[in-house]
Amino acid sequence: MQRSFTPSKRSLHVRLITWFILPPIMLLAAGEIYIRLQPNPSKFKHHFLTLHNSEVDTLILGSSHTYYGIEPEVLGKHAFSLAQVSQTLKYDNYLLHHYPFENLRMVILPISDFSLYEDLEDGPEWHMASRYRLYMQCDIHSRWSAYGWEFTSFPTYCTKLKQLWTPSQMSWSRQGQGLEYTLDSRQEPWDNGTERALHNRYETFEKAPYGMKHLHEIGTYCARRSIKLVLISTPLSESYRKAQHCAQVEDTDRHIRDFIRMFPNTTYLDFRSSKSFSNHDFYDADHLNRAGAHKLTSTIASCLRNAPNTVSSTTR
């Protein structure tokens, strides 16, 4: 007599897991691999510095204010921008120590409203910290942490997967500047000062010592190697300046004055209220477009030639 085969409950469970769980996992893994293979600014910058770090004599650090707002080419063929969107002082400090800059002569670092108070991992853009682990071989976070994968921020993961059918608009120069912010591409109303000032606003300043710790380490690194440190505050539209949190601005200014007293060879160039920049130079209320970036970088180069150790308020 032929026996009929009845699958056990265990084998049935295994099949169900295989049919319903494995396909989504495989799709997730495929998406992860696809995203990691795509070009991005972090991957480009790491590749460039792995090969050419010894050639860099001027290094631009910072957030989107310098990623878009400074044109390295104006500063010379050996200038390079390591700035990235939402990059904090913690990562500026880390990256400065991460690559062996044997011939570095100058570091340019922005001081913005949020600089002393922002901790990337504690904010809504925490997922951006993964770029340092995934694409720049930084070991601040474990490979197996939430910062070791793209999919752990699922909304961002899904947005990046859209590159399958919509090409990315990100672009950058050979020396690391972000190129998307042009006058033609800016959206109206561009002068969103109230919105942007609120985005960068901190009501309490208890994190300032943490930010200053990293700034002091950058200052010490530069001083020990006779590297010129240039702090800059980039131009702001009038609507942005009117919406700034005065106590936050005063706290930042006080800390920067103290820093310069400790590191007197630091140059500070303050362009926040500079009248040299018109509406045509801005992309939004606190970012310059490419034309504005060219103007700002040319002005910085001129200031450094004429008064290399000036704490400038005449740029206002």
Regions found by a protein language model. Give the residues of each.
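N-terminal Lys/Arg-rich, disordered targeting/topogenic segments
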Residues: M1-V14
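Alpha-helical transmembrane signal-anchor/signal-peptide segments
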Residues: R36-D57
